[in-house]
């Protein structure tokens, strides 16, 4: 009986080891397909410009600025109005003309979301240090292509990431997201990858819900390692001076 239990333990340990190796292999190939961790981490700033299209027919022009470590800013223009959301690594804030037009600091939930957007590498790079738990749960068909499905868990929140089995690039993320004031299960679909400073980046991201495209972001210009001062992300001074 003791020998049987020992044998079973070895089988379980062996299966766990193989599974861990499979996950590590997928992550390694995904990082290599993007250009490798060295190239990914060599990008210190990103300035991305493009158009955001909504299901209701609205279109907004935007400039998205990201800087290491943990700084993010999104500037949008719509019908002559300028809307800003930003995070300086500690404080998340926004300016919205439809909500009074004054800079306002955001709550803890918004800080958490903005911190995720400020992560230039994505959750699959240094995932353990960032507090994620990853599990390779199998494969799935994504628009006719096989993709590896990775379950990602952090702070009781779960999402699923799909890595294309041929290109090894991120094809899709399934997660919960706030849409028009309500939480919904959405698909974030990534396509049209192009080289930026030796790193493959998607030039198109679509957010789908119940099979319908709710929003798409098309990037027309992406510049890496441009000079962006930290003040660009800081909460505006009380006199309203724009930074």
Show where each model-derived region lies.
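Flexible, processing/modification-adjacent segments and terminal tails
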Residues: 19-32, 39-42, 91-157, 178-184, ...
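N-terminal mature ectodomain segment of secretory-pathway/periplasmic proteins
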Residues: 21-100, 135-136
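Bacterial N-terminal signal peptides
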Residues: 7-17
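Gly/Pro-enriched, hydrophobic low-complexity segments
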Residues: 79-81, 145-235
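Residue-level detector of beta-strand face positions
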Residues: 47-51, 75, 93, 139, ...
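Positively charged n-region of N-terminal signal peptides that target proteins for export
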Residues: 1-7
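Short amphipathic beta-strand/extended segments with alternating polar/hydrophobic composition
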Residues: 61-65, 84-89, 102-111, 163, ...
